Amino acid sequence: MKKYLLLVCALSCIVFAKAKDWTQYVNPLMGSQSSFELSTGNTYPAIARPWGMNFWTPQTGKMGDGWQYTYTANKIRGFKQTHQPSPWINDYGQFSIMPVVGKPEFNEEKRASWFAHKGETATPYYYKVYLAEHDVVTEMAPTERAVLFRFTFPENDHSYVVVDAFDKGSYIKVIPEENKIIGYTTRNSGGVPENFKNYFIIEFDKPFTYKATVANGNLQENVTEQTTDHAGAIIGFQTHKGEQVHARIASSFISFEQAALNMKELGKDNIEQLAKKGKEAWNQVLGKIEVEGGNLDQYRTFYSCLYRSLLFPRKFYELDAAGQPVHYSPYNGQVLPGYMYTDTGFWDTFRCLFPLLNLMYPSVNKEMQEGLINTYKESGFFPEWASPGHRGCMVGNNSASVLVDAYMKGVKVDDIKTLYEGLIHGTENVHPQVSSTGRLGYKYYNKLGYVPYDVKINENAARTLEYAYNDWCIYQLAKELKRPKKEINLFAKRAMNYKNLFDKESKLMRGRNEDGTFQSPFSPLKWGNAFTEGNSWHYTWSVFHDPQGLIDLMGGKEMFITMMDSVFAVPPIFDDSYYGQVIHEIREMTVMNMGNYAHGNQPIQHMIYLYDYAGQPWKAQYWLRQVMDRMYSPTPDGYCGDEDNGQTSAWYVFSALGFYPVCPGTDEYIIGAPLFKKATLHFENGNSLVIDAPNNSKKKFYVNSMNVNGADYTKNYLRHENLLKGGTINVEMSNQPNQNRGTKEEDMPYSFSKQQ
């Protein structure tokens, strides 16, 4: 029996080692079982190419509903081109296509069809579903800016395809002599100029025997063109059983002519060929990180998270006839040369999504960084939340982190002068229409060293803490660029502004009034108010650049550890009076049974790694494995809160590898503990890094010892430049904590206070 089990185990390892198809472990439905009241990811199946301009998804929600696909739904209303980064931000430039039989129904309720997940195939590059109501199988395989649909119809004299250009301003034209439909949608949720349009072209391979257009719900047969609030079209034909009708679709934010250029991405490929190319594109990026020695659920969770990390920010540029990048500017409405990416919120993604790109996909991030320079040139500000232009959401000036971390890690924009100019501009201005862009409250902050609690600027303590870290990032770049000493010293001083909010009595961060007094009354369990989607227990740790300074404020490492431990020990009680209701982030904290630790939202996601700064890395190792095991799974309810455009997924990717970028802008990754027995990172420079932990297991999650390229290694961090050199990190795991490793002062990671 033992020999049999060993043989099965060995064979399974061989199968995994040979299967270089990493997409087989990706579940695009992970996190899709979400609602307004409780998020388990708030994702949808994004059928796309990595960072593709357009995603496609089956649509179960009503037109305009941010929850466009939910796993618990049982009807599909259409197949939608989407650019939605989050249900809270919603979509723009969306339109849909839907096969129907029997009657030419345009109404989304009447055309909807029952479906079952057993009849659904979802991969990153291909989607297939059986629509029971119409007896039609729908398949789709996208490129970056185009898609091929294949509809397999039953025998019917009345088979149709509905094209819905959505409401709030749209245009449609049926061109029967060319088997073509063209149109545009202007639908958006904000952040666009007045001339915004998404132009689309749809080409069919079967002549139409029926044609109609729709204006605001009114079906008009043999009318071929509509410009109205809500336009649509229906074309039809006779089909025999099993007949396949194809629809080739391309779109452009620039023009119909550019959409025609984008259609060339499909070439003459059939759907199998496009799916194969999509699979290859995904395997190329997923395969940059190979993990071995885990169980099937761990593989699925890891690669599903890596897939989510490689979707946003998406390309918002197109290629002209000469193959050069060109973009419609969502900031000034002009068509301009160069790169543009969008659909990301830096409040979320500065933390580890962009550091992951810097480490593993720097050439793509180089394009993103150039796009940020273009954003500043076109709007006067770097974005903080872009979808597709500036959106009023969240706090902080974290574009500084995204730009500086990239530059310091060798992902350098061509125009560093404009980069630095834009960073300085952002510290002294706020966007006149979008107050979350730039720095709201900057005059108070620059004068007092904090944004006051009592001057009617919401979430003021959160702003202060993030501005201080952002100033440290600018300080880092100013030093690198050898800026005048006075300038460097200014940002060094402002980087310490976090201290202005520390309350010695509670040993927590607390809102502070303009006259210098602290807010009163003060409840550390109160969500919102002075903080953003969290409370003081969550935000106190937002001193990414200076944990030692925070340790000193709390009275030393012992008290710091006690306060950290308390986050898990304090019951999941809360004060929701600021919101007047239990917001979903609160509920996600309470249901996870981990005290007041709220991993479902970003402010606290780095906190566990701070144990390393206080000389108790084994506590980080314990809690990290707890979070990975209890709060992630490759299932529709697989996240413990909003996935947030790759951030919560990238946290898992880094943590499963055994390190994490607590402070973007430094060259350090803080060591946790690997999840897999082996991981291999293939860098763009041609080097590979192997992380080998052969005795890793469910019970052996503590790091007993570590060596790097054969040399004993006790530090609690790894350096970026050393990782890129490749080599081997050997980790001996244990079921007992080693309380002697990583405890010496020289083992501690970077803190700004130590440099002063």
Sequence positions of predicted segments:
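ATP-dependent phospho-/nucleotidyl transfer catalytic cores
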Residues: N470
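Bacterial Sec-dependent N-terminal signal peptides
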Residues: M1-K20
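Extracellular attachment/recognition segments
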Residues: Y702
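Accessory carbohydrate-recognition regions in carbohydrate-active enzymes
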Residues: K20-F354, N358-S401, Y407-L465, C473, ...
